[in-house]
Each structure stands twice: as C-alpha cells, then as structure tokens.
C-alpha cells in the first residue's frame, strides 16, 4: 500500500493513504495507541471502501508507523493535531469518523472540533481518557515513581513483544484532553459504539459512559458477545463493515 506525506503546520510529516472514491461522504479511520494504518481493521475498511467507491482515508499519528517523530516524544495532544489536519487537508467530503481503541477517544475529540465536517462517528472498543484510568487504577506506586523520575516506563503488552512505552508527557497530555469529565458530550452526530463484552483491556462500560453523556438522539451501543479488545476476527470485522454501511446509508440522504 503506497502512502503519501502530509506536511503539517507543526512541521511533522504524517503518512497517509487516501482513496478519493465517488461518494459524497467519506470514512476517516483513527488507529489505536501504538497501532498504525496497516492494522487489520484499517485495511479491511479501506478495501471495502475501494470496492464500493467510497472515499476513505487512513493515516499514522506522529511517532507511529511511517510518520515522523519518535513515539517517546509524542502524545495525544499531537495525535489530535495530526488527526485534525488530516481531516481538514486530506479529505474532501464530510466524513464518518471511525476510531479504534484510543482512536475512538480521538474521533470524538475531532467530532467536537469539527461538527460541520463530521457526518457520524463509529467507535470500536473505545478507550476514552485511558491515560487517566491507567494512572489512577493500573500503574503501581513504583511505576508512577519511575515515570516521574525517568519520564517514561515500558509495560508488557499482549499486543506487542517489546511492550508499551508510557510517558509522563502522554499522561499529562491525556489530562488536558479528557472527554468523560464533562457532564454532557456535545456530540449530536449519529453515533455507533461497538464493544466486546470480554474486552480485557478496556471495559465496554467505557463505551456506555460515552453513550450516556452524548447529546445525540441517534446513538447505538453495540455489545459483541465474547468480543475481545481487538474485534478482528472475520465475524467481528463483518459487523464493523455492516455498521459502517448502515450508518453511511443513513447519513448520505
């Protein structure tokens, strides 16, 4: 898959793939933390869009995949900036924002920042405010001390043999971008929240929190029986595509 480079106003180079398509509405995909546009869900969405001639855009956050910067120097603040520029400089139609894990958090931030350019939002195993949850509930006192002392720690991950780097910078940036602290979320767009009931990484109750706080009257919480955090088996991918198709049909009118 050939990619292009977007030079952002923050002097970062963001790798992206854009299929122009023939549709009046496009899909913009936001990957998870430590993931990139070569992920299973991203590729599946892109191929499905191409088959149907729907506009589709994939990209890598800075510090991820083929984009510039080091992961350790990047945070959700930069990733939201990157996402915003991709939406406004690469895509040419109103978009359905579709975000996986941390990408669900970012998709909602982007929807809040761009209400006119957003047509709908789909989240898959959304991880809103996960940095706050990590700090509060998951890191030990020793891990917190190490982060404060060294600026980062590495924690083991079942998704990456080298583990995840958790930085002080990203914990702090997360606190500036929280969405669940507000009483209501000004999301008025159609919203589809897909989550597995067996998600060990992020409870489906996180999607329920978004569901309860959003202003949208057209919101659906879709719980996948026995679904894990990845939601990447064939049946689950099919469900994501079906949800994308029905939302597309609904908002294109």
Feature map (PLM): residue ranges:
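Catalytic nucleophile-loop/oxyanion-hole region of alpha/beta-hydrolase
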Residues: 65-90
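Short beta-strand immediately N-terminal to the catalytic nucleophile in serine-hydrolase-like folds
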Residues: 97-99, 124
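The serine-hydrolase catalytic nucleophile loop
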Residues: 33-46, 205
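The alpha/beta-hydrolase serine catalytic core
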Residues: 117-223, 228-253
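N-terminal cap/lid segment of alpha/beta-hydrolase-fold proteins
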Residues: 1-21
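Short beta-strand element of the alpha/beta-hydrolase
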Residues: 24-32
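Gly/Ala-rich beta-loop-alpha elbow adjacent to hydrolase catalytic centers
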Residues: 99-107
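Conserved alpha/beta-hydrolase
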Residues: 42, 46-68
């Amino acid at each position: 898959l050939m990619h292009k480079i977007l030079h952002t106003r923050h002097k970062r180079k963001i790798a992206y793939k854009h299929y122009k398509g023939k549709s009046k509405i496009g899909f913009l995909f936001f990957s998870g933390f430590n993931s990139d546009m070569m992920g299973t869900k991203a590729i599946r969405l892109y191929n499905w869009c191409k088959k149907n001639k729907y506009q589709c855009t994939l990209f890598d956050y800075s510090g991820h995949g083929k984009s510039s910067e080091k992961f350790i120097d990047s945070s959700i603040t930069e990733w939201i900036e990157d996402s915003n520029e991709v939406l406004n400089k690469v895509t040419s139609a109103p978009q359905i924002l579709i975000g996986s894990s941390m990408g669900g958090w970012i998709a909602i931030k982007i929807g809040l920042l761009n209400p006119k350019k957003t047509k709908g939002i789909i989240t898959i195993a959304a991880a809103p405010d996960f940095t706050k949850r990590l700090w509060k509930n998951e890191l030990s006192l020793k891990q917190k001390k190490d982060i404060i002392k060294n600026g980062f720690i590495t924690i083991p991950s079942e998704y990456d043999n080298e583990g995840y780097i958790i930085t002080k910078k990203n914990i702090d940036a997360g606190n500036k971008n929280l969405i669940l602290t507000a009483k209501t979320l000004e999301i008025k767009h159609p919203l589809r929240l897909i989550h597995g009931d067996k998600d060990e990484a992020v409870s489906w109750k996180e999607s329920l929190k978004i569901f309860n706080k959003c202003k949208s009257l057209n919101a659906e919480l879709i719980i996948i029986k026995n679904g894990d955090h990845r939601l990447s088996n064939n049946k689950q991918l099919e469900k994501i595509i079906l949800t994308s198709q029905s939302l597309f049909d609904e908002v294109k009118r």
